[in-house]
Amino acid sequence: MPFVEEEFEILKPTKALFLVRDVLKCSLKEAQRHLDKQRLKQNQQTVRKSQIIQGVVRLIYFKPNEKQEKLVFEAKDFGVFDKPAQIYTHPKGYFYHESLLDCIQSHFGKNAHPAHRLDYETSGLVLAGKTLQSTKDLKALFMQKKVKKTYLALAHGLVDKSIIINKPILTPQNIQKDLRIRSQISPLGKPSITLVEPLSYNPFLDISLLKITPLTGRTHQIRLHLSSVDHRIVGEGLYGVADENAREYLQLKRENNAPTLMLHAASLEFEFKGAHYKIASPMPERFMPFLKD
């Protein structure tokens, strides 16, 4: 795990903000971000940024692991990373789990950021700008729908022909608090379209391998759309299941014990500064046991 916890002994009274700055050799703004995320503790108590400290403290910080390479393509202004399943694209609250942002910034520096995101459960390609400006320009491509994204998924049941799923998606606000991340098919939702193409079928497991092209970018769109046509993705615990099962799945996710979702962002195709790019990621090893011999 690239987040490490290290102990330091402070011999004379020192402001917490300055300590973090000096230890991590970062700016005051970056040091403040670490303190806001409650990463400095003394006697198991969170240290505030204005606090004067002395004695033994413990600091949690990201230490890049050079052996854990995920960069699959690099250009002058951006890179493309292959995110594993069950890793966040961005840091999540006060948690110290690895995120893809950590990997991106270990390669390109602190001004590098993802231009879009993948769900925690989904693996595959993520485009990242090397600077704030390039990230802004790349985000504009996604907003203007100038990036073609394709996914691979393993889904329950036989899909023997192409499907266009055109169902509006609503992200509700006034629902059970513990299930608030779940989107819904609703006439009040935003237009959402997903193209589904069958690639193969394993009759022994009753599982189809699908190529999926989302034409819109709603939260959990592919997962919700496939569940809505009775082809739930293998490993899906949030959609197409009863509320109690969804709650159990979310608890397992918090404990890092949730089943792996069989959804992979397989390719990105776009034009940027006069050049055409098509970047592909191979099918994940976790898919192989489900495929027909």
Swiss-Prot record:
Catalytic activities: a uridine in RNA = a pseudouridine in RNA
Note the Pfam families from the entry. Answer: PseudoU_synth_2
Q: Which GO terms describe its molecular function?
A: catalytic activity, acting on RNA; pseudouridine synthase activity; RNA binding
Please tell me which top-level EC class this enzyme sits in.
Answer: isomerase
Q: Matching InterPro entries, A to Z?
A: PsdUridine_synth_cat_dom_sf, PsdUridine_synth_RluA-like_CS, PsdUridine_synth_RsuA/RluA, RluA_PseudoU_synthase
Query: Which GO biological process categories is it annotated with?
Result: enzyme-directed rRNA pseudouridine synthesis
Q: Which residues form a coiled coil?
A: none
What protein family is recorded?
Belongs to the pseudouridine synthase RluA family.
Name by which UniProt lists this protein: Uncharacterized RNA pseudouridine synthase jhp_0321
Q: Organism source for this protein?
A: Helicobacter pylori (strain J99 / ATCC 700824) (Campylobacter pylori J99)
